Curated annotation (Swiss-Prot):
This is Cytochrome c1, heme protein, mitochondrial. Residues 71-277 are mitochondrial intermembrane. Its EC number is 7.1.1.8. One of its GO terms (molecular function) is heme binding. Component of the ubiquinol-cytochrome c oxidoreductase, a multisubunit transmembrane complex that is part of the mitochondrial electron transport chain which drives oxidative phosphorylation. Residues 297-332 are mitochondrial matrix. It comes from Neurospora crassa (strain ATCC 24698 / 74-OR23-1A / CBS 708.71 / DSM 1257 / FGSC 987). Its cofactor is heme c. It catalyses: a quinol + 2 Fe(III)-[cytochrome c](out) = a quinone + 2 Fe(II)-[cytochrome c](out) + 2 H(+)(out). Heme c binds at C110, C113, H114, M234. Residues 139-162 are annotated as: Disordered. GO terms for cellular component: mitochondrial inner membrane; respiratory chain complex III.
Length: 332
């Protein structure tokens, strides 16, 4: 009787304990589901707030510092036609005869207004001029020497280490001689303009005889559809037969423009031949190294990629109790 009473009390305590555990589990699951339902809402609110702050910051920045304006074809200028320049090909170089003709066009036409302040006389040797021609050309100009004992600066003939002289003493003199417009330096003009050689060639050959109907040209400007705004201070400078080439090449407008553009491209990038040679060497070496790396990878990892793994679990012996039961039954 006492044993039954103890057993009943134990069952009652166990059932109460299970009920309490289930209630606690149910309440915990309810809380977790509520938290899970609230967490996406909080994340969405936080994401929306962060997006609003970022968009507001960008809008405020552009309100303070940004400037947006519509661009018309007349304001932007016509896009230059793409021309097949030979020196832009991978395995081609400059035409040295064209460089010599282009330098002649620059000296006789462009040098009166535009400078080449980054090109020394020594860079012309072996590419455009001989050593004697470059020395004679340098000696035609005078350069300042170092101050002497009395502090006076004297003049000396130019040397190969000197740079091509500027046509004006300073920017103010250049603006005064060109109605307020400052002629740009042509040392890097090909690299500094969108379109490069195509743009410079189109600009030099794009002057019409008369502005088209409806085109407005400001005072002191010339119409050129390739220049942004179509109004340029530089007038047309290339005409047929303007230059007498030494090699007898007909000096048409397009020929002179082509030669001077190729010369200006060389002036902006005289190391183009070295760069192309270095690029070819890099491509050859990297190709060989890549082929070797592929071979070594396949050779080293072939055994790992071709191996087969078979799962063979160990077989466990039958339990000893199963073997002993028949013997016990036989004895009984």
């Amino acid at each position: 009787m006492l044993a039954r009473t103890c057993l009943r009390s134990t069952r009652t305590f166990a059932s109460a304990k299970n009920g309490a555990f289930k209630f606690a589990k149910r309440s915990a699951s309810t809380q977790s589901s509520g938290a899970a339902a609230e967490s996406p809402l909080r994340l969405n609110i936080a994401a929306a707030a962060a997006t609003a702050v970022a968009a507001g910051s960008i809008a405020w920045y552009y309100h303070l510092y940004g400037f947006a304006s519509a661009m018309t074809p007349a304001e932007e200028g016509l896009h230059a036609t793409k021309y097949p320049w030979v020196h832009e090909q991978w395995l081609k170089t400059f035409d040295h005869q064209a460089l010599r003709r282009g330098f002649q066009v620059y000296r006789e036409v462009c040098a009166s207004c535009h400078s080449l302040s980054r090109v020394p006389y020594r860079a012309l040797v072996g590419t455009i001029l001989t050593v004697d021609e470059a020395k004679a050309l340098a000696e035609e100009n005078e350069y300042d020497t170092e101050p002497n004992d009395q502090g006076e600066i004297e003049k000396r003939p130019g040397k190969l280490s000197d740079y091509l002289p500027d046509p004006y003493k300073n920017d103010e003199a250049a603006r005064f001689a060109n109605n307020g417009a400052l002629p740009p330096d042509l040392s890097l003009i090909v690299k500094a303009r969108h379109g490069g050689c195509d743009y410079i060639f189109s600009l030099l050959t794009g002057y019409p005889d008369e502005p088209p109907a409806g085109a407005s040209v400001g005072a002191g400007l010339n119409f050129n559809p390739y220049f942004p705004g179509t109004g340029i201070a530089m007038a047309r400078v290339l005409y047929d037969g303007l230059v007498d080439y030494e090699d007898g090449t007909p000096a048409s407008t397009s020929q002179m423009a082509k030669d001077v553009v190729e010369f200006l491209n060389w002036a902006a990038e005289p190391e183009m031949d070295d760069r192309k040679r270095m690029g070819m060497k890099v491509l050859v070496v990297t190709s060989v190294l890549f082929a070797l790396s592929v071979y070594v990878k396949r050779y080293k990892w072939a055994w790992l990629k071709s191996r087969k793994i078979v799962y063979d679990p160990p077989k466990s012996p039958p339990p000893a109790t199963n073997l002993a039961l028949p013997q016990q039954r036989a004895k009984s």
